[in-house]
Each structure stands twice: as C-alpha cells, then as structure tokens.
Amino acid sequence: LGADQDAQENFFRPSNQDPKSKGAGGVPFRTEDDLRRLYEASRRGNYPLMRSYSGTRDHLQYADMLVRTINNAWCATSLFWFNAMDGRGPSPLEQSIREHMELMAWHGERDIPVEGNEPYHWGMRDAPDVVVCAVSYIYSKVAKKMGVRDYITTYMFESPPHLSNRMDLAKCLAQIELAESFVDESFSIWRQTRTGLLSYPLGVPQARAHLAQSVMLQMSVKPHIIHVVGYTEADHAATADEVIESAQMAGYVAEVALRGSPDMTADPVVQERKEELIAETHVLLDAIRALSPDLDDPLTDPATLARAVKIGLLDAPQLVNNPYAPGAIRTRSIDGAIRAVDEQGRPLTERERIDRVLARAEVME
C-alpha cells in the first residue's frame, strides 16, 4: 500500500494536510477506518499479505497504527532518507537516522520483519556504485544491531537507468555479499528485487519488454520476493487490470527462469566488477569508521553517519544545493558502470575520491 505524502507525513496532523496535494505519490488514506476497509477488501482470493511504507513523522505511532489496522506484514523504512534531506519528512538528517533506528528496534522487539528502502535512493540520484554498496552494508549492520531478525533487502535494478545489465548484476552481487556477511542464526536476509522506477520507456510495447527482461535479470540473483513495478510507470498510475497484467508477466518470466536458465552471475566480467566493488566499498567503510575512531561501532552511530553525508563520503550528484550534503561528487557511466570521476571525467579510485573529500572538508572546517 503506497501512501500519498500527507498520509505518510501528516496522518496524525490533519491541520497540516493540503487538500490540493491529495493522492500525490500514492493512496490518500486519512483515517484508521480507511485502512481497515482496505484490509477487509483484500481478504479474498489468495488472502495476500498486506504492508505499507512507514510514516515520515510520528514514526512509532504510525507503525503501531499499521499493525493494528492492516496487520502490517513487514516494516519498510529507510536510514538516510524520508526526512528534511529529501523533503519527505520534517526531521533533520541525524535525528532522522535515530528515528529510523528506533523504528527498526520497535519492529525487532515484536518479531516483525524490516525492509530496507535505502541503497537504491542513492542510485536513483546518480551516486557511484561504491556508495550504493557501502549503504547496503551499513543498513544490514544497523538492522542487525537494532534487533531485527528478518531483514528484507531491496535491490532495485536499473537505478540509475544507464547501468548496463552486466554492471547492474555485478553491483547487485556485491551488495548481496556485503549485506549477507552479517547473516547468522539470529539474523536472516530475504532478497527482494524490483525494476527501476526511472527506467521504463514510454512506449507500451517497449515498457512491457523492459519489465520482462528486467525480471529475467533479477532472477539470476535468486530473489525470495519480486516487487513488481507496473509497466505503465513512466506514463500513468496503473489501473487494476494493468497491475494484474504486470504481475502475470513477471510471474511467467519467473516460472520460465526457475525451469533452468544460464548462469549470468558466472560471467567473468561480472565477477571482476563485483570483486572490484567489494574491495572499493571496504575502503569507503574504513574512511567512515575513521571519522569516529574512539567509538566501538561508528557505522551504527547516527552522528558519524550524518557526518559522512555532510562532508561527502556518502554523496550523490543530485544532492547539490542540499543543506545536509555537498552534492559535489561527479559520476559518469563508464562501460555501463557508475563511477566517480574528476573534473575532466577521469575515473577516480575510491582512495583518490576520499582524499579529495577529506581535503575539502578540512578546508571548510
């Protein structure tokens, strides 16, 4: 259940709601009865699980409301987003990180799974693949520390859309290896894949083809859940029939793939890029840890994470002019991979990029 902006931010604050923006970005539910009616309407057919995205204000009150009204199957929340940095909520970045952590802990205490809506938000803003991979590692680490037992990782392919299939797959495999390094008897990970929200072509035949080829690529990482993005995404909000059609298309592709498909993950080019990304990601993670050398676990410290964004260790080109991040990083698609580059478009190693970031931060301070 995708909520509109006022449902997510101002559900408990009707006076702050703007009737002119009703339905902006999702379903305009306004009362608990609205949610109960939606849940009752779903009690037919195969009696599906139902879940909604978390609120962007009054987080714990909103979470409790979702559990009571729609038996929320799992929490879906972010770590760095859905706050003042992206305009989706009122909280400053560091406070928002703390609130997201509290929300994870609340669900962990109740043995409710948590889905991470995080890495692809960096990808959609043209961040380099290394930053996306680093955030995958950080979110998994934070979720485990907050007591989450079942973590649903979200891998949005084609984000940004100028990734090649080869490099997209390599990035996903790197994220999987990094995130799943925390798996043990107390912490399970369920892989969820989806097609890129910004990747669909406008033409209907091309969009249908894109959905099918995207799901086939996703199946190579053996997802437990496929989040189907309707093929109409680039043109209009999907109708019920179009949602059903999109799900049937994705389901058929998944069935075909499960009968036996070539192993695209074995491509040596894919494997080489995956290993490169993992190595470069650890360079970035070490740089973030070094911001707070006196802490035992800097990667789960809200102040450290907010500072990593503030100085540009975690950055994206589309964060330019943002009060919480420099947006100074430059990226380019090179051979289908998203890499950080210098002013002349030359690819930078992660060590080179970090040295530039730290030098700039020292001057600014």
Region spans (language model):
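Acidic, glycine-enriched catalytic cores built around paired aspartates
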Residues: 1-14, 18, 45, 225-238, ...
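Catalytic alpha/beta active-site cores
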Residues: 1-160, 350-365
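Residue-identity detector for glutamine
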Residues: 5-8, 17, 61, 95, ...
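Generic serine detector
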Residues: 15, 21, 42, 52-54, ...
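Aromatic-enriched hydrophobic runs in primary sequence
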Residues: 28-33, 55-61, 65, 170, ...
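Generic structural signal for well-ordered, non-membrane alpha-helical segments
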Residues: 28-35, 59, 93-96, 100, ...
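Structural signal for hydrophobic packing residues in well-ordered secondary-structure cores
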Residues: 39-46, 67-70, 104-111, 144, ...
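Long alpha-helical, hydrophobic tracts
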Residues: 90-91, 111-245
